[in-house]
A protein has these predicted regions:
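Structural beta-alpha unit
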Residues: 1, 24, 71-105, 142-153
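Small/aliphatic-rich secondary-structure junction motif
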Residues: 1-49, 153
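Gly/Ser-rich helix-loop-strand patches that form or flank binding pockets
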Residues: 4, 96-153
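Phosphate- and divalent-cation-binding pockets in alpha/beta enzyme and binding domains
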Residues: 17, 92, 114
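Short, solvent-exposed amphipathic alpha-helices that sit
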Residues: 21, 58-69, 92
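General small-molecule cofactor/ligand-binding pocket signal
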Residues: 35-37, 81-85, 136
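Acidic, proline/glycine-rich short linear motifs
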Residues: 37-64, 143-153
Length: 153
């Protein structure tokens, strides 16, 4: 069914929700490979290449986080890779899905975050309008976060 699943992670407890679903899904799809992406969208991340900047401490932490998740997935028998991108999250996720030949994007949604989502919309909402890759959205809230985290804190 699916061969390569792109999983955007946010470096929050919500990630455990989608990762639990993706583990099950990848297992039923002949161990589909999993591509993790975190899109840093701070000023440094958006301008790192244009201004030849070094990774910020936040970006280093994000890289360590997604690499730890990839290592955990690999220990469980999945083929996994981690990508740290910078820029507009929806656009970077959509571009990564095409570049990495992913046939599914699986991500969490967690409802509106106040006025900012009303004004600019959520990443999930924007992504579904700009990608041709199917998107699986799983609603997550602190109540649905699994008891045992995927990556030790």
């Amino acid at each position: 069914m699916y061969e390569r699943i792109l999983v955007p992670v946010e470096h929050t407890p919500y990630d455990d929700v989608i990762l639990a679903h993706v583990r099950k899904l990848a297992s039923t799809c002949n161990n589909a490979s999993i591509v993790l992406i975190h899109v840093a969208d701070g000023w440094a991340a958006r301008n790192i290449n244009a201004l030849n900047l070094r990774e910020s401490e936040e970006m280093k932490s994000d890289r360590e986080y997604i690499e730890a998740i990839a290592d955990s997935l690999e220990k469980d028998g999945f083929e996994a890779e981690a990508i740290l991108a910078g820029g507009d999250p929806a656009k970077e996720i959509a571009a990564c899905a095409v570049r990495e030949n992913c046939d599914l994007i699986a991500m969490t949604t967690h409802g509106h975050h106040g006025i900012s989502d009303v004004i600019r919309g959520s990443v999930a909402s924007e992504l579904r309008h700009i990608t041709m890759v199917p998107v699986l959205m799983v609603r997550a809230s602190p109540r649905t976060t699994p008891a045992s985290p995927t990556v030790p804190s």
